[in-house]
């Protein structure tokens, strides 16, 4: 901090105060909802990033930690197994859905994720359509829950068969809250 303030003649406290409110879209991004649960969008798209965010959120002692996620197609299958195992171990409920399936079948990807989940005692449901999965999470939320929509983060598209379709989780959440979904 001192190096930055020295060159730019900015007070250290100004930098500290700014860092306290700095936010990065899609990284532990809290989406306001008019209910007594917490809804978070995060870009966690591999086991390590998922583990980091879930272990951190677990420290808040939620009623339940619910993780909705999928895995990208045309990527190493081991990532799917690892993500399933990580979510199964750290979440009270995993909601398995689609992500950027690219040129792979969504259900094949989901089956690979389930292989990882099977290594744990974790509860899970499969909701193949991501919009429906978000609605499922919100409809089944209980007071004190933390819901993590993992994998998309800042992305506002879904890639399927070489085409990027507009899909912004923030817009989907707003539609659900407004009764449009």
Locations of regions flagged by a protein language model:
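ATP-dependent carboxylate-amine ligase
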Residues: 2-181
């Amino acid at each position: 901090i001192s190096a930055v303030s020295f060159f730019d003649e900015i007070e250290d406290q100004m930098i500290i105060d700014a860092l306290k409110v700095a936010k990065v879209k899609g990284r532990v991004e809290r989406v306001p909802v008019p209910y007594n649960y917490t809804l978070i969008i995060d870009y966690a798209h591999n086991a390590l990033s998922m583990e980091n965010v879930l272990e951190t959120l677990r420290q808040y002692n939620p009623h339940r930690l619910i993780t909705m996620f999928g895995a990208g197609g045309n990527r190493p299958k081991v990532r799917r197994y690892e993500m399933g195992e990580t979510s199964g171990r750290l979440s009270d409920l995993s909601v398995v859905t689609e992500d950027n399936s690219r040129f792979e079948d969504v259900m094949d990807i989901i089956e690979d994720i389930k292989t990882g989940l099977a290594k744990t005692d974790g509860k899970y449901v499969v909701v193949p359509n991501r919009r429906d999965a978000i609605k499922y999470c919100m409809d089944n939320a209980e007071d004190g829950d933390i819901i993590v929509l993992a994998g998309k983060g800042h992305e506002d598209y879904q890639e399927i068969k070489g085409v990027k379709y507009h899909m912004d989780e923030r817009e989907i959440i707003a539609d659900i809250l407004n009764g449009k979904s």
